[in-house]
Design a protein with these regions (language model features):
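A general structural signal for short secondary-structure junctions and capping/turn motifs
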Residues: 5-7, 61, 89, 131, ...
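Hydrophobic residues in beta-strands and at strand termini
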Residues: 3, 71-73, 162, 187
Length: 187
């Protein structure tokens, strides 16, 4: 697919209409089969997905209750009439609706979850980076670099190899997301 990529602080989470969608479990599960990586299946990643969110409808087996990114389901005036017509027409056509796009069944007409708190976008830069930059020991942020490999010691990621123009170097953290993240996982 040709996807717009968020080449800004916060990555694609800063440009994606505030949609909060983890991706289908089979996408994550295929990484192990295709690239031989361990620990990247949907079930193994689910605790991390839950840790990053505070879900407006409450914590559950699939949702967190005290993470930095607030996730909601559009209600009231936030339900655009065109989106409502799309969901309703899918149900009328016989498709089984799902109540939770990030729950046990991700298929069927439903409302997207949104990374929204009040009326403020909940991007990774707002929820993770800004607080870290305001802290006592702020990280160094490198822009316009491309991660090429994650470095592990004893099962823990301890660094990232990256390219910045013609310079290749090593860093300490990666924020590779679901859109294009598999290229870093397999490197």
């Amino acid at each position: 697919h040709a996807w717009a990529r968020g080449k800004v602080l916060g990555g694609s989470g800063s440009i994606n209409a505030m949609a909060h969608h983890r991706g289908h479990p089979s996408g994550y599960d295929s990484w192990q089969a295709q690239f031989g990586v361990r620990g990247w299946s949907f079930r193994e990643l689910l605790p991390y997905f839950k840790r990053l969110e505070t879900f407006a409808l409450g914590a559950s087996d699939y949702h967190g209750g005290d993470g930095p990114i607030h996730v909601d389901v559009p209600r009231g005036e936030l339900r655009h009439p065109t989106a409502a017509a799309f969901v309703e027409s899918g149900i009328a056509a016989g498709w089984k609706a799902t109540d939770d796009i990030n729950g046990p069944s991700m298929e069927g007409p439903t409302w997207n979850h949104v990374a929204l708190r009040g009326r403020q976008r909940q991007s990774p830069s707002v929820c993770y980076l800004r607080p870290a930059l305001a802290g006592r020991n702020p990280p160094t942020v490198l822009m316009n670099v491309r991660a090429t490999r994650l470095r592990f010691e004893g099962g823990r990621c301890v660094g990232v190899d990256f390219v910045n123009g013609d310079v290749t170097a090593a860093g300490a953290a990666s924020t590779a997301g679901r859109v294009g993240g598999e290229s870093t996982v397999r490197a």
